[in-house]
Amino acid sequence: MTDRNRSVEMEAGIHDRAGLAPGWAATPAGARAAVRSGRYNGNTSGMAPGHGQGNLMILPKDWAEDFLGYCRANPVPCPLIGMTETGSPAVPMLGDDIDLRTDVPRYRVWRHGELVEERDDISALWQDDFVGFVLGCSLSFEDALERTGLRVRHVDEGKVVPMYRTSIQTTRVGPFHGPMVVSMRPYTPAEAAIASAVCAQLPAAHGAPVHMGDPAAIGIADIGCPDEGEPTAILAGEIPVFWGCGVTPQAAAMMARPPLCITHAPGHMLVCDVPANGLRLLCAQGDEV
């Protein structure tokens, strides 16, 4: 396999889906193949409709037990759906051919809690002691929302979903702690009630919203300035609806400061073979680690 260890700043143009063959992202395997081959490194919203997508956290083994406990203690923002064997990039429970070194469109590399670079391939950084964690993602429930007749604004606008750090604190486990990060989609109050009922059936994709309405109530000062992603329009009669977000572990890693960890870049997810409604939590609050 050709090593694509290049900075994303050198990848101008391959975030554009228009130049790819029709139907390339209709299946998980097709989406991953485009990413793995270097033909695409953009956001994954709307890809392989009906299938699960995952956030990524890769850590040295010495840090893995505490992070597993952190997921158990915080299942809403950190719903664990897949985990590798030590040193293996494979996640067979989510897809037979998944390779965590190449199959995420864009990775973030963190050293001692600092973001040092973004890459579209981490093969050169892979270590024999790495453990990979895949966490459920809100992009997994967007197809379910659309099938009920609810539009997803950031998809319609061709943007990455807006994400915000909040004043809601996660439960600390070992060195991992910090604020919950949330994603936002605007709906009317009636639509929000429908969205909540739909998403409550999908706990492996963050479940029901954690907050609806006033952003200031959860510590968001300016809804027009997300911490990650892109701002999206909120129309007259709509309220912001907030879900737990799998970028939360990145905030926790900034506090824990492991010597090296690798995550996905927000909005650039691992597309899985498992249907969104077939994803299962590997551990939940109260389970034994």
Task: Please annotate each region the language model reported.
Residues 2-136, 177-289:
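Metallocofactor- and cofactor-centric catalytic cores in central/energy metabolism, strongly enriched
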Residues 105, 117-174:
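Aromatic- and glycine-enriched beta-alpha-beta binding-site module
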